[in-house]
Amino acid sequence: MLSNRKKIILKSIIENYSKEAKPVSSKLLTYTLHLNVSSATIRADMAELEKQGYLLKKNYNSSGRIPSFKGYNYYLNNLIKRNEEFIEMFSFVDKIIQKKSFTKEQLIKKVLELLSEFTSYTAIAIGSDILKTSKINKIDLIYLNYFELIILIVTDKGHVQHQNIVLNQKKDVNMLDIKKVIIILNDLLKGKFLFEATLIIQSDIVKKTIGKYINCEEQFIESFVEIFANFVDNNCYLSGVLNILNQPEFNNIEIIKKLINCLTKKELIKIMTIKKRLTFKFSDNIELIQLENFTIISIPYSINKYEKGQIAILGPYRMNYHKVIPLLEYLSVYLSNLYDLNN
């Protein structure tokens, strides 16, 4: 249990470190907090906070302290206050979005653009798990020539994916065989969720059946699996990726490369599993990304009953949480209303 004075000191260290990205000294806290105690008393409290794990061990090149993972966790759960001045910007956000009509995709992209601009961090959006919410409505194979086809898949939600495939087989593919394969695939997969279709098409019985008409069935089936993966990839958006370059924590070129490589759509989906509330993920708890000092804050949004997902901010540990959190909360709650206003 932290005393009120220690809470004030911890809160001040975190918020000062967020602004300056430099260790916070007891001297600075003495001048700014007006606690009517000596600098020595504040130093003793800081030493105690360090022992309790809320601050990182003192760096002897500096007289100050920086928050630890535990310190940030405590701050986010107990000490943070929403920035009232920043909340006043919400009406400005409304005016920008209500100026013109957006499709759902355009609206989400605009929201991310505003998030990244207002926070100077990287904004992320991931739609609902399309593999579990969309069913196959139609499969078509468009015959281009003896070896080349276009695979076309349409879902019940109107999502469309297509892919060219050049078949590596010795004999030509004829149109009659293609028509038979189309009938077989539609019989098997129409009305199935995308994740079910992914499993079905890789089954031995389907491979054997398709192999009667197309010699290179393995290549053919792999192309279908790639299309199903594309449905997921096209359900993820990023804005402000280069904002990472402005953060002193990420000024090492190797760190930047690693972080940007991790910002691939498939990796993000693994990190950002859908939750029903505001969620904080610190790099210490993300095994997928072997980097330090960054945080992902995510919150669910809902455009309608079926189209749900998450919006998130990725930034350094010391991000301005009191600004970021109210903006995320606001956009999450009102994303559905904003879409209604634009239609």
From Swiss-Prot:
InterPro entries: DeoR_HTH, GAF-like_dom_sf, HrcA, HrcA_C, WH-like_DNA-bd_sf, WH_DNA-bd_sf, WHTH_transcript_rep_HrcA_IDD. One of its GO terms (molecular function) is DNA binding. It comes from the Bacteria. The keyword Lipid biosynthesis does not apply. One of its GO terms (biological process) is negative regulation of DNA-templated transcription. Keywords: Repressor, Stress response, Transcription, Transcription regulation. SUPFAM superfamilies: GAF domain-like, Winged helix' DNA-binding domain. It holds the Pfam family HrcA. Disulfide bonds: none annotated. Belongs to the HrcA family. Negative regulator of class I heat shock genes (grpE-dnaK-dnaJ and groELS operons). Prevents heat-shock induction of these operons. This is Heat-inducible transcription repressor HrcA.
